[in-house]
Amino acid sequence: MPRGSRSAASRPASRPAAPSAHPPAHPPPSAAAPAPAPSGQPGLMAQMATTAAGVAVGSAVGHVMGSALTGAFSGGSSEPSQPAVQQAPTPAAPQPLQMGPCAYEIRQFLDCSTTQSDLSLCEGFSEALKQCKYYHGLSSLP
């Protein structure tokens, strides 16, 4: 006896449905999908600018740390150290003007971090950038 309350004999045998005299109606052609509502997330340009700022900061910190470690392990010499000649990277294509809520702060911080050998001098620009990102909802402060 089956476990359920119905027995197998009480179910009618299913038959395939007879073909309909009318063909099934085709669904109406769909209109263009509605544009998604803005989600409050930063746009592509803002994300690219933030990523570029992070890359530049990481590069600057890496260069400072690398030169500090190299200087510490290379031993002292009586000659003053020669500053490394920095070449500005040549962009393959002209970069569009960065637009975004914190573009000015990003530019100021990047300019400072690329021209100063001591990144502690750029701390004010870093704080201004953090405040701008927080104010515009692009990040949360720790």
UniProtKB/Swiss-Prot annotation:
**For bias kind Low complexity, which ranges apply?**
1-20, 80-90
Which InterPro entries does the entry link to? CHCH, CHCHD2/10-like
Name of the molecule in the record: Coiled-coil-helix-coiled-coil-helix domain-containing protein 10, mitochondrial
Gene Ontology terms: cellular component? MICOS complex; mitochondrial intermembrane space; mitochondrion; nucleus
Q: Where in the cell is it found?
A: Mitochondrion intermembrane space
Signal peptide extent = none
Motif range (Cx9C motif 1): 102-112
Report the residue ranges that make up the CHCH domain in this protein. 99-140
Residue ranges annotated as compositionally biased, kind Pro residues, are 21-39
Report the residue ranges where the short sequence motif Cx9C motif 2 is annotated in this entry.
122-132
Q: What does this protein do?
A: May be involved in the maintenance of mitochondrial organization and mitochondrial cristae structure.
**What is an example of a Pfam family matching this protein?**
CHCH
Where is this chain primarily localised? Answer: mitochondrion
Q: What is the effect of changing S59L?
A: In FTDALS2; results in disorganization of mitochondrial cristae
